[in-house]
Amino acid sequence: MGSNDLINEAYDDSEVVGEERESKSAWMKRWYQLLTSPLDLQLVINEKLEMINWDAYAKSLAKPLGNFLTILFFIIRLLQDNLIKPNYYKLNVKSGAFDLSKSNKLKEFDYLWEISSSFQNNNQFYAFQSWYFVTLRFLNNLFRFTIFILLSLNLYVSCKFMFGYFKTYNLFHLKKEFNSPNLTKHNLKDLSKEYYEDIYKQSLWSMLKHFFRGSRDDGPHVNQNEDEIFFQLRKWIPTNFMINLFVSFSPTAIVFLSFSDVSFTSAIAIVFHQYILDYIITKRFQRSVDDDLILSSAALQEYEDKHIMARINQCSNIDTLSSAMGTRSKTPRIFTTHSLCGEEIREVYNYEKREFEALPKMTESVPGSRETRIKDYGGISQVSDHQSHPIGFHYSPRMSPYYRDKVLDNNLAQSSSNENLEKGGAYLPNQDQNRPSKSLSPLRKTPLSARQKRFEGSEFNVLNKNDINSILRSPKKKKNYHKR
């Protein structure tokens, strides 16, 4: 590679030229977009303004800005009443009203012309052309323009504060109608697209009325159900930035300064007005609203801790009754849910498999046996017929002897009844609950009258009647049954 090639590579500015062309083309595209679609620029500016957290600048920007605008308005009104108003006639007098040099009659007579010229020089008819009055005239025009800008800005801030911060809430679960002008009643059909299509078909006045007022339906709704009606709340929620700006640049102070003669003593009234308004709205009313939010949050948190979390968390329900073991947690073992079709599903948690298992469905025609009910109460998925007590059934220290004796008596009674029934051929209605299939049960092959006669003649008649009565008890009385 020669020296010329190295020099050409060192001084190769093709990349720089390409970047300059790209920058120029980008600027051309931006100017073209600005000229062809100015609304896009407006959308971008509004998006940038909405992304700013204005409430964070409420104390540092809004309040000083409002106080500065109020003081500026006071100074301008003070100068207008004490500097411009005394010289109002001299500033607004016409320059050619008493100009005798322009009179043709006086020019015809020489002595009258001399008198008129001396009279004008001695009385200074052209005093308004001096630098002092020229400056006052400029200040007068500047003050008028500034007053117009400040009044327009104050009008915009006031209208924005009072009418520009409303949020609409649709309340579908509210049943009681409150006496509030912001709460209106509507039909659920108003939320459909057909409702808006009907509005577009109406007159221009109806469309404008709906655009500015919204959909209002204050009728009695006599022929409508409560499920077809919802309430709409239009709540006024001004931002913290706008509240501080409105308080510091209030329309009451501006109106007071506009229609009164302003002097230095008027500053005392303005300072007192600013302090009282800031104290009432910002330090009292706004803090009262914040305190209400704190109380509402505390009440909601208390409800969540006591009712919602107590049902979600199994270990949060604490039994505070005095016992030998102290306080212990009560964990529900059987969980009742519903499927998408509305069917009730009863599940129990298996600690060995660490998963939920569905319990067999309980029908009204065939009640469950005592063993099945004890199994459901204890939360066990499988129980063997030859065991003295269910697997995994945990008794308390005080109630374990009672439950153990009950289960042993129940197993002995069932085993003896089964042996006797195999010999005698009688069948009881609570024998086939643990069998896999109901179609293979011999109870269905024996008529009901024969079963009843054999059951009444059995020696275990009293025992089985008590057993059936205990099984047919209400599920809500399980605790009373076990405690008895």
Swiss-Prot record:
TM region(s), chain numbering: 145-165, 252-272
Phosphoserine: residues carrying this PTM: 3, 417, 474
GO-annotated biological processes: maintenance of rDNA; regulation of exit from mitosis
Subcellular location: Nucleus membrane
Membrane topology: Multi-pass membrane protein
This protein's GO CC annotations: nuclear membrane; nuclear periphery
Keywords on record: Membrane, Nucleus, Phosphoprotein, Transmembrane, Transmembrane helix
InterPro entries for this protein: Nur1/Mug154
Region (Disordered): 416-457
Listed Polar residues bias regions: 430-440
Subunit record text: Interacts with CSM1.
Note, other: Present with 606 molecules/cell in log phase SD medium.
Similarity field: Belongs to the NUR1 family.
Protein task: Member of a perinuclear network that controls recombination at multiple loci to maintain genome stability. Required for rDNA repeat stability.
Name of this protein: Nuclear rim protein 1
Organism of this sequence: Saccharomyces cerevisiae (strain ATCC 204508 / S288c)
